[in-house]
Amino acid sequence: PYLLRNRYEVFQFSKGGGLIQELVSQAFYFKQYNPDMVILHCGIVDCACRAFTHKEELFFQSNIIGKIIRKLLSTIITTKRIRNFRRKSWTTPKDFVRHIEQLKQQFSNIPVFALSILPVSCEYESKVPGIKFKVEKYNELLKESFGDKLIDLSDIQQIGIMSDGHHLTKAGHQYVLKKIIEKLLIFNL
């Protein structure tokens, strides 16, 4: 978003580790700015392979019994092993689509675009088995939901992605800026 400020007035809402449902719950506040368009960048936190569902994690964190159970499970079987076996996502595909539609309804009078989730490298897949399948699935949901308003990042070069597999480098930010501007020009924005 920072690089877009040379061409557009930008109101940015970012939440590290944020889920799409949290973006939807804040949409009313974003709407007060009367934006000309919305560009959504979410999905990796929603679809990433996890040991436990979001509700399970909240239970573990909310009380002493949950914390003890979580500690025992993680001691007996590592969280990584549980994750690799269960491959849970914090947002189900059905809920992901439902939240997308809710967000689009909130901004029904303006164009709503979405960035695809970054492609998964072999290294990232080896660290988090199953992530490639999940990302492809959720990208397909984004494509179905946004159609020609999806900004496809699938051809980003690996130099544009940090070693963690899901954050952008300086080159990656430049690439995304180029892709956003190309798409906005198609829509005369």
Residue positions per predicted region:
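Serine-esterase "nucleophile elbow" of acetyl-processing enzymes
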Residues: 1-38, 143
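Alpha-helical cap/lid subdomain in secreted, periplasmic
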Residues: 25-189
